[in-house]
């Protein structure tokens, strides 16, 4: 059963009317209602607030990494373990083909249903997850395979065990190693891009965000609690943090924004998956045609955080 957010109530009402028209066999009413639905969707989604975009990024029906992998990756083979400690189910690694292009895919997976969410640790990776991702990146480099990374996490797991096993070191090592990989790398934020937990698999030649995703150094709720000691200031924090694709593109922190279906990826995962596939293939061709892509990646990373101070 579809889940609707509060600002989608009118969409839900019209959708229910369409279903009733289908039951009655009233094609004329169905056609009228579908036109009304399209108009309502355009009206709502063209005027979303940043807080509503945050809600969409976290929508329970939003496609996760495994949804996209199942739809776009063929002849796939999953790889487990980090060769150091354990296998972290919050990060999934696959070898397969996207339109007959051999590729390594690394994704952060939140899981669906209570049992699977617990297995995936709600998409919050431990150090062994990031080390597994690095292992696969080195595999891709050895066999000259491009890498697609699907980012979707509230953040790296902050548990005591994770810290004892070197959470910060594992993330830092990934930043260092992914920056110098000798194969094309493409990272897409498909939902939440939370802090270092997201950044650990977001260092790439091309960094893109889905239209209704977010990328932030801390959750807006956490920011509000720290700065104002008031979690109700979340909407204020969102505006101050600039976490939406549009804001981050304007700041030069991401390369591209991937448009979603008219009702969002959570209403049409098949179209969203096809868009991701096409973006990956186009970006890969662009990178492969550039003999200086390694230098360009380095220069892009080195330019982050630079600023010019003017004296009046």
UniProtKB/Swiss-Prot annotation:
One of its GO terms (biological process) is fatty acid biosynthetic process. Residues 36-286 form the CoA carboxyltransferase C-terminal domain. It catalyses: N(6)-carboxybiotinyl-L-lysyl-[protein] + acetyl-CoA = N(6)-biotinyl-L-lysyl-[protein] + malonyl-CoA. InterPro entries: Acetyl_CoA_COase_a_su, ClpP/crotonase-like_dom_sf, COA_CT_C. PROSITE patterns: COA_CT_CTER. Gene3D superfamilies: 2-enoyl-CoA Hydratase, Chain A, domain 1. Acetyl-CoA carboxylase is a heterohexamer composed of biotin carboxyl carrier protein (AccB), biotin carboxylase (AccC) and two subunits each of ACCase subunit alpha (AccA) and ACCase subunit beta (AccD). This is Acetyl-coenzyme A carboxylase carboxyl transferase subunit alpha. It comes from Helicobacter pylori (strain J99 / ATCC 700824) (Campylobacter pylori J99). The lineage of its organism: Bacteria, Pseudomonadati, Campylobacterota, Epsilonproteobacteria, Campylobacterales. The gene is accA.
């Amino acid at each position: 059963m579809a889940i609707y957010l509060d600002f989608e109530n009118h969409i839900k009402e019209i959708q229910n009317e369409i279903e009733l028209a289908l039951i009655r066999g009233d094609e004329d009413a169905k056609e009228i209602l579908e036109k009304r639905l399209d108009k309502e969707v355009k009206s709502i989604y063209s005027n979303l607030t940043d807080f509503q975009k945050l809600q969409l990024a976290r929508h329970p029906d939003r496609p996760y990494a495994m949804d996209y992998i199942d739809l776009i990756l063929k002849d796939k083979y999953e790889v487990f373990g980090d060769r150091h400690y354990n296998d972290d189910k919050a990060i999934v690694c696959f070898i397969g083909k996207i339109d007959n292009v051999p590729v390594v895919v690394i994704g952060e997976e939140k899981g669906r249903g209570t049992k699977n969410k617990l297995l995936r640790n709600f998409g919050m990776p431990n150090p062994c997850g990031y080390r597994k991702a690095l292992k696969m990146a080195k595999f891709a480099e050895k066999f000259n395979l491009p890498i697609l990374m699907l980012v979707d996490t509230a953040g790296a797991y902050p548990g005591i065990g994770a810290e004892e096993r070197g959470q910060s070191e594992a993330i830092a090592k990934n930043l260092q190693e992914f920056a110098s990989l000798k194969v094309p790398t493409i990272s897409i934020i498909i939902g939440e891009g939370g802090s270092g937990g997201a950044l650990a698999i977001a260092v790439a030649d091309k960094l893109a965000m889905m239209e209704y995703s977010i990328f932030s150094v801390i959750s807006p709720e956490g920011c509000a609690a720290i700065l104002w000691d008031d979690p109700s200031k979340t909407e204020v924090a969102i505006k101050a943090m600039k976490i939406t694709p549009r804001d981050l593109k304007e700041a030069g922190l991401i390369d591209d924004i991937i448009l979603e279906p008219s009702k969002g990826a959570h209403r049409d995962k098949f179209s969203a998956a096809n868009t991701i596939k096409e973006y990956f293939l186009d970006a890969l061709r662009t990178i492969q045609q550039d003999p200086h892509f390694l230098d360009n990646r380095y220069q892009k990373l080195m330019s982050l955080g630079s600023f010019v101070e003017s004296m009046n």
